[in-house]
Amino acid sequence: MEKFASVLLSGLLLVACGGNQARAKRPEAPVTPKEYTYAVRSVHPHPTTSYTQGLQFADGLLWEGTGEHGESVVQTLDLETGRTEVFARLPQEDFGEGITLLDGKLYQLTWQSNKAYVYDLKTGKKIKEFRYPGEGWGLTTDGQKLYMSDGTANIYTLDPATFK
């Protein structure tokens, strides 16, 4: 009787563990990643003293937000000549981060000051300032809303009028 019980138990364990089927499964072939190629179409001059944190191309100019303690600016860069023109200077205590353009305004994040600045594109004057929790990193738009990253796994969708 004991022999029968032990054979029965062994058989049940074999079936429960998949028996020969578990060994019959073959691992899937590794997926080969798709390889992309690229070609550099042109190279443009750029000041090596500008620590780029945000870029956007619009109306023939490259808009650049730079980050540097005490020296963060938003500037335009003419890609043909390499000439830059300062559009706005951030307060000394702010480290500039991501920028984006929307509806005649330029939005800029700060890294750890918890502030976003909004400038009028025609005059360069600051027209609004918003506060937000956490750090500011990247900023973009879909033409209606703003999308902000803060260095975490989250992307935040924001109303440009309220920054909420």
Question: Where are the model-predicted features located?
Answer:
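A short helix->beta-strand "capping" segment at the edge of beta-propeller domains
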Residues: A29-T48, L79-R83
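A short beta-strand motif characteristic of beta-propeller blades
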Residues: V40-P45, R83-R89, K125-F130, K164
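Beta-rich, blade/repeat-based domains predominating
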Residues: T48-D59, Q92-D103, Y132-S149
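Beta-propeller domains
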Residues: E64-A88
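Short loop/turn segments that connect beta-strands within beta-propeller blades
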Residues: D78-G82, D120-G124, P160-F163
